[in-house]
A protein has these predicted regions:
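Long, Lys/Arg- and hydrophobic-enriched amphipathic alpha-helices
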Residues: 1-115
Length: 115
């Protein structure tokens, strides 16, 4: 699973006392997620602590639970060592957006479980 969400140590978010459900219309946050059904995008943070715990209770073994930042930095480091030309072709700004803690690096989590 790869999504934005909270881990077991930061759920529920103290800065989100009303929960994590949000509505966006034209890329702007809306005040009421129930207004204008079908005309706005609804989203919510995943509870990775609960997902991890539920998987383990069902017999899955957690192989990896980390931030997108750590996951992608590790994956790209291995790829760049084996194929240095890839680093020249990569758009560094795109990689930074995916891995920077203030952008998508920390809010997105990676959970890998197996039987």
């Amino acid at each position: 699973a790869l999504d934005y969400g909270h881990g077991p140590d930061d759920w529920p978010a103290a800065n989100q006392p009303d929960g994590t459900v949000r509505g966006y219309r034209c890329q702007k946050l809306v005040d009421d997620v129930l207004t204008d059904p079908g005309k706005q995008d609804l989203t919510a943070h995943a509870n990775f602590g609960l997902a991890k715990q539920s998987g383990e209770a069902a017999g899955l073994q957690t192989e990896l639970f980390t931030s997108q930042e750590r996951f992608l930095n590790g994956a790209f480091a291995e790829m760049l060592q084996s194929a240095p030309a890839l680093g020249q072709a990569m758009d560094v700004r795109q990689l930074q957006a995916l891995t920077h803690p203030a952008h998508m690096g920390r809010p997105f989590r990676v959970l890998v479980q197996s039987r």
